[in-house]
Amino acid sequence: MQAKPFSADSNTPALVIDGSGSSVFVGVLGQDQCWLAISQQDGAPLESLFPAVEAALKTAQLSLTEICSFIYCEGPGSVLGLRLCAMAIETWSRLTPTSAHYFAYNSLQLSASLICLDAPSSTDELLVSDWKKGAWNAVKINGGAPGSTDVVDDEIIANWTGRLFHLPQRKGWQKPPPNASTLTYSPQRLPEVLHLLALRDSVELYSSGINVFQKWTPERHRAVTTNL
């Protein structure tokens, strides 16, 4: 059975938590798909998350028991920030089990979708973020639509002839690719792309490792032939 999409009528107010970037972002989303409150804290995730949540709930005049769902960034991004946010959400949802609805979004998919929203004719573009030395998380954009989140290596980036975007991470293992346009991560624009939200049974984080052995390449897929 297909998972139910996010509904602003039944799943709000929703607490949005994003620890993937250089700062911790927290927001409270209301029924009109607009922010009731936003709080963004710089500094280490351990020191920033709870003050950001407290500030957002205070501005929205809500308590955790009144939250209908948790929306979180699954990554890729700061491993420490993502894990800390995941543990916090799991703890809070146990306090209010009837409200334990989880919706996830991918940081690269969010950024790629915003590129397409701002420039609907975007094509032959590549968005990358640092994963580890010699490897990058990447989303290819074609026909104004983002593809899947995959892993590419330095060679693919060096040979890329289209427009290249780079999404900075809290801690990078390598310098941004030459000729890449640096993006500002914008989780505050999430209400513009709520279709990205995926229902989860539990708080699950994105793992780049599952794509290592199926790296995306710019070549067209060729049909596999076998000798019978």
Locate the predicted segments by residue.
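Oxyanion-binding and handling regions
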Residues: 1-29, 44-47, 103-228
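Long, contiguous secondary-structure blocks with strong helical propensity
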Residues: 19-23, 30-33, 69-71, 88-90
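Short amphipathic
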Residues: 36-39
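N-terminal phosphate-binding loop and adjacent alpha-helix
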Residues: 41-57
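Buried hydrophobic packing segments
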Residues: 53, 88-92, 111-115
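Phosphate/pyrophosphate-binding loops at sites that engage ATP/ADP/AMP, CoA/4′-phosphopantetheine
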Residues: 53-69
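Short glycine-rich phosphate-binding loop at a beta-alpha junction
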Residues: 65-74, 162-170
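DPxDG-like acidic metal-binding loop motif
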Residues: 69-100, 107
